[in-house]
Regions:
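A conserved beta-strand->alpha-helix junction
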Residues: 122-130, 297-310, 407-410, 439-452
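Short, glycine/charge-rich flexible loops or terminal/linker lids adjacent to PRPP-binding catalytic cores
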Residues: 294-340, 350-351, 379-391
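PRPP-dependent phosphoribosyltransferase catalytic core
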Residues: 165-166, 201-207, 358-479
């Protein structure tokens, strides 16, 4: 997915920029970047690969190069190298994005036909952030340029632009990914995650709306473009992406996860000895489930946090498998002979869960393994956010099972996505069988949306029900 952070201050911003960006590290594992501005040095940039190390480890030794900066932006990226520094008729600026551009090749060709050129490459193709920057500089103003991005791309794009006199923050026009503004005396900040704010003494001041453009300076904030009326914020922020202490649209992540588990327990008739979460994003749900069910919450599986990152996002499948195997350690003393219900955020490929379940039975002596999932089955690929490193919908376990049953992975998707239908139940039973589970239940869209606490019309549930295909165009038509 990726996360961005920016800050502007009446004094040095370097420490806040460094730590604020680091607090977005759970959103990506591939690259990190910082760009700053000072009247003495101008724009300064640094980018590092994070696949073999952490953000702080890579950037801390070189922070002195940013000395004296009073404004800056940072990014944790799962795709391209960024931020980029551009020189144009709009002036010099640095830009970072959280974006997925489905029609990237088409737009690249369009710009090449206009005699524009690309200097950056990302994994052998156009750098999406440079593509966005080139669309921006076609406008007469930053507002016009950003609206040009919204009108042209399919997918989503949230961005921060560092100029000589401030930081421009633009949220994607359907509001899928957040930007929250924080403030403290003499400084303003913007972040994908409110988690960045408390330890840096920022208070949440404002949440940028869908398609809204604001500019922050050290002494205040101004609106450049008003927010759109419609919103489709990504439900997976509360299911998986979000850090427990973060809040989006006024709805806290951990609170939603706890409520999700609590409500699911009230409708579940399984008998178990205890409940446990698959760390980290299954933990809050498991605590809620245990409270709702009236059974003990126990840490039957522990995550070795000092050195092992998330296994969801590494681009290499063998690395994902290695991380998944090494990071989770079963506690045999709490598992042997027990009936345990586990809570997890989602099932994507199913490979990690299948291997973990086998270990629980074969090595830890588990008697029964019941799995409860925070969201409905993932039936549709996400065209809006870099949800996983998957290149094909066939990496989804649901699609492989549908192909097994129907002979066509794209047939009768709506039936399989409908909770309670014969096709749905047949698919869930097959998933449970393939993964070796005693029982398996997924949450419903209705219960998930209720736990989040926003109206269904404002929450994107496309990966569960395919309902948001009409919003593929980034530009939100208010008519």
């Amino acid at each position: 997915m990726g996360g961005i952070f920016g800050t502007i201050s009446k004094k040095s911003c370097v420490a806040d920029l460094f730590y604020g960006t680091d607090y977005n590290s759970h959103l990506g594992t591939r690259r990190g970047g910082l760009a700053t501005y000072s009247s003495e040095k101008g724009f300064v940039r640094s980018i590092h690969n994070l696949e073999s190390s952490y953000f702080r480890t890579k950037f801390e030794p070189t922070l002195n190069k940013f000395e004296g900066a009073t404004s800056g932006i940072g990014v944790i990226s799962d795709t391209d190298a960024q931020p980029l520094i551009m020189n144009s008729h709009l002036g010099r600026f640095a830009i970072c994005t959280v974006a997925k551009i489905v029609n990237k090749d088409e737009l690249t060709q369009l710009l090449l036909e206009k005699n524009m050129h690309f200097a950056e490459m990302s994994s052998g193709s156009t750098n999406p952030t440079e593509l966005v920057a080139l669309l921006i500089i076609q406008g007469k103003t930053f507002r016009e340029g950003i609206e040009n991005v919204f009108h042209h791309i399919k997918g989503s794009c949230t961005m921060m632009i560092l100029t000589e006199d401030g930081i421009i923050c633009a949220r994607d026009s359907w509001g899928r990914t957040p930007i929250i503004i924080g403030k403290k005396e003499g400084a303003y900040a913007a972040s994908s995650e409110t988690t960045s704010f408390p330890n840096l003494d920022y208070e949440t001041a404002y949440e940028v709306g869908p398609g809204e453009i604001v500019k922050i300076k050290a002494d205040g904030m101004e609106q450049i473009r008003p927010a759109n009326k419609k919103m489709q914020v990504c439900s997976f922020l509360w299911v998986y992406y979000g850090f427990p202490t973060s809040t989006y649209e006024g709805k806290n992540v951990e609170e939603a996860r706890f409520t999700n588990g609590f409500n699911l327990a009230k409708t579940d008739d399984v008998e178990v000895d205890c409940c446990s979460g698959i760390p980290d994003s299954g933990t809050g749900m498991a605590m809620g489930y245990a409270a709702g069910k009236g059974v003990p919450y126990q840490r039957c599986i522990a995550k070795y946090t000092p050195t092992w990152p998330r296994s969801f996002t590494p681009s290499n499948q063998s690395m994902r498998s290695l991380v998944a195997k090494m990071k989770l350690i079963p506690n045999k003393a709490m598992l042997k002979g027990k009936r345990v219900l586990f809570c997890d955020d989602s099932i994507v490929r199913g490979t990690q869960l299948r291997d973990n379940v086998k270990v629980l039975f074969d090595q830890a002596g588990l008697k029964e393994c019941h799995m409860r999932i925070a969201c409905p089955p993932l039936v549709y690929g996400c065209p809006f956010i870099n949800f996983t490193s998957s290149k094909s919908d066939m990496e989804l376990i649901t699609r492989r099972i549908i192909e097994k049953f129907e002979g066509d992975a794209n047939k009768n998707l709506e039936k399989y996505a409908t909770t309670g239908s014969p096709e749905y139940q047949k698919m869930v039973d097959e998933i449970a069988s393939q993964l070796g589970l005693t029982s398996l239940k997924f949450n419903t869209i209705e219960q998930l949306v209720e736990a989040i606490g926003l109206p269904k019309s404002q929450v994107c549930t496309h990966c569960f029900d395919g309902s948001s295909a009409y919003t593929l165009n980034e530009f939100a038509d208010e008519d």
